[in-house]
Amino acid sequence: MTVLERLSRAGFRDVTTVEPVTGGLAADAGIAHREHGPPVFVKTFADPPGDDVFAVEAEGLAALRAAGGPATPDVLVADRELLVLTLLRPRPAGEAFWERFAVALAHLHTSTVHPRFGWHRDNWLGQRRQVNTWAGDGFAFFAEHRLLRWLSEPRVAAALGVEGRAALERLCARLPELLPERPACLTHGDLWRQNVLSTEDGQAALIDPAVSYTWAEVDLAHLWTTAPPPEARRFFDVYAELTGLDDGWRSRMPIIQLRQHLAVVAQFDDDWGAAETIRATLAPF
């Protein structure tokens, strides 16, 4: 079934064209232009990885919005085959946008502190299920459900080999020494900068979440996985001022970033250097 047919079945019968958009890695996405209404954002999978993939994404967007942090788009349709959202705008140029985003993200993280790590249901990171079983120990949660869970993936096993696997296991055993003990808070969970857009009035808005309650630094590390644009230089300073984040977070970042690098290696033939980065991070272990 084509995207136009799926949209028509969902009630959008006035769509004339669907303009593909780039930036996403796991799904097909586009802007649906309509005869009698505003354009909307649409997302589909040729072969959905699960029946609940869009339902849990919609729920994640709702949770982020309810927390009063960065904005999220309105969900118009979320079924097995289709996600339709109100259309957001590209990020505006300039430091002011990133400073506003820092304030909103700091509010999200500081206002949602939670006694446990996880989420009330599993969700998805790309086309792989993200296990969110509740845990009281953040180190055990991150080790089991965010790092070691990737070792069963064939591409990860091939990239790491026996020595790399053992190094990752040793690193996980030492997480309480390597990372500070921090509370859980609500996180976006897939916060690379392509998932940061803008509302009409220039406020930061987020898409494509993989929410859970975990360390706030998971979001920061993900945002820094690719070099931030020059206009974002004040983002981290503003965030630190509002949250009390210590200067050592940058040195911890490569360990936390292992999660997204492992996810990339697991899911894509072209890993954009992720396997090499993983091996470099694991080398001391």
Regions found by a protein language model. Give the residues of each.
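An acidic site on a long C-lobe helix of protein kinase domains
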Residues: 97, 190, 254-257
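Active-site Asp-x-Gly
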Residues: 51, 136-143, 182-186, 193, ...
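A conserved long alpha-helix in the C-terminal portion of kinase-like catalytic domains
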Residues: 149-173, 177, 215-218, 222-285
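Short, low-complexity, intrinsically disordered N-terminal peptides in bacterial proteins
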Residues: 1-11, 35-38, 283
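Short, solvent-exposed loop/turn segments at secondary-structure junctions
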Residues: 47, 78-82, 90-91, 147, ...
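Conserved N-terminal boundary motif of the eukaryotic protein kinase catalytic domain
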Residues: 12-19
